[in-house]
Design a protein with these regions (language model features):
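Conserved mid-core segment of classical short-chain dehydrogenase/reductases
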Residues: 3, 28-31, 126, 131, ...
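Short C-terminal tail/terminal secondary-structure segment
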Residues: 33, 51-55, 157, 206, ...
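Catalytic Tyr-X3-Lys loop
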Residues: 145, 161-180, 197, 221, ...
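Active-site helix of classical SDR
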Residues: 183, 217, 225
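Alpha-helical segment proximal to the catalytic Tyr-Lys
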Residues: 188-189, 230-234, 292
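Residue(s) in the substrate-gating loop at a strand-loop-helix junction
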Residues: 201
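Short, flexible catalytic-loop segment of classical short-chain dehydrogenase/reductase
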Residues: 243-254
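A conserved structural motif in NAD(P)-dependent oxidoreductases
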Residues: 268-279
């Protein structure tokens, strides 16, 4: 049996020494990096690694000793959020479904910041597993202040009529019911000034023909955010949503057509895809006291991918 390729070691982000901004690949440069990977793709297997360097980011202890549970934190945006929270002083529970190697790399990066980290291998489609994840977070890390709903499933299909029923159910069960189950499990333990942050998507506002089912769930997440914000506002618990544009993560080579991968990010004003370490600071804003008067907000981090709902 072939040995599992170890995850490439991501350089540990510096808390206090921002450097020059890295060069980000443009959409025109993506063709040379394009590859197709099987789903679920491991970040460790990507030729062009998503940027997690946080080279221009300066931490300021904005989440000191807070406890965060981040779903889908083994790779991509979720990993970047976990690392950014750790840089700001939080302890992090990393919830993931399948990719142990990637999850262990996230744990290494969190612990490199001097923070505690636990791994929770769970399926957010199962309400009982969501409750168990919250119980373990509270028991092993000492509480829960921040829930980040980020786990997601997508699979592109050229023809809407051909989307299999199994795919549609998995997409909705993961992307919207999973968020609901996690919120239901977490809310009884959240206090004033704690928060929930959901990951939406610009395609939940604009639509996209090859991801119809996924777009529907992201639109539902935006509505869930606003509804929960009104429900939890009287208790001082904030609920917000980060709305990314195209971001370079393992989902792209695993779920998108090759012709889309080869020009990924072409449709935005900045003419390139975002990198995970460019998205994570929005989550820090919403989790920290800097966002204390923000609730029910859809925070666009899209590189200029516009929608009529901005």
């Amino acid at each position: 049996m072939a040995k599992k390729t170890p995850a490439p070691k991501t350089p540990v982000a510096s808390k206090t020494a921002p450097q020059a901004a890295p060069k980000r690949p443009t959409a025109k440069e993506m063709k040379q990096h394009a590859q197709k990977l099987p789903y679920p793709a491991a970040q460790a297997d990507m030729r062009l690694q998503p940027d997690m360097s946080f080279s221009t980011y300066r931490a300021a202890a904005k989440l000191q000793d807070k406890i965060a549970l981040v779903t889908g934190a083994d790779s991509g945006i979720g990993r970047a959020v976990a690392v950014a929270f750790a840089m700001e002083g939080a302890h992090v529970a990393v919830l993931f479904n399948e990719n142990v190697v990637d999850a262990e790399e996230t744990k290494r990066l969190v612990e490199a910041q001097g923070r505690r980290c636990i791994l929770l291998q769970s399926d957010v489609r199962d309400p009982e597993q969501c409750k168990q994840a919250v119980r373990r977070t509270r028991a092993e890390l000492g509480g829960l202040n921040i829930l980040v709903n980020n786990a997601a499933f997508q699979m592109s299909q050229e023809k809407f009529e051909d989307i299999p029923e199994e795919q549609i159910r998995r997409t909705f069960d993961t992307n919207i019911l999973g968020y609901i189950w996690m919120a239901q499990a977490a809310i009884p333990h959240l206090q004033k000034d704690d928060c929930i942050i959901n990951t939406g998507s610009i395609v939940g506002l604009t639509g996209i023909p090859i991801l119809v089912d996924y777009s529907c769930t992201k639109s539902a997440i935006h509505a869930l955010t606003k509804s929960l914000a009104t429900y939890l506002g009287p208790r001082g618990i904030r609920v917000n949503c980060v709305v990314p544009g195209p971001v370079w993560t393992p989902n792209i080579p695993a779920t998108m057509p090759r012709e889309e991968i080869e020009k990924f990010g072409y449709e935005v004003a900045l003419q390139r895809a975002g990198q995970p370490d460019e998205i994570a600071p929005a989550y820090v804003l919403l989790a920290s006291a800097d966002g204390s008067f923000m609730t029910g907000s859809l925070v666009h981090v899209t590189g200029g991918k516009m929608s009529s709902d901005q």
